[in-house]
Amino acid sequence: MQIPERRAIVSIHHEVDRLVAESGVQDGLVLVNAMHITASVFINDNESGLHADYERWLEELVPFNPGSDPASGGYLHNRTGEDNADAHHKRQVMGREVVVAITDGKLHLGPWEHIFYYEFDGRRRKRILVKIIGQ
């Protein structure tokens, strides 16, 4: 993945669905894992208002601040020269990966469940691991 923005929610549902279909697995599990510590994979409704709510809520919870002085709202992690401490915290809240059942060769999800990649510190190339296990 290469997200040009600092933060973005991107649907990866159809790509995961395609990989499951191509695998030929009829009964099993698929693991979808953000392979970076500043990104998440999660499942929820594909509704833009909800995504905007996530953005607002996470920014209120852990606001972006490139500084490293806690007295002014900065983060000690940013003393490393990075400015992405908030991204690490946001990933902890949203999680690392999802595991979805495969039944009859298809993703076994609820009617409103959709798989997303959530980038918290974009502008660089990142990977997603999709591991399909089953028969």
What are these regions (language model features)?
Residues M1-Q135:
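Active-site histidine-anchored catalytic micro-motif
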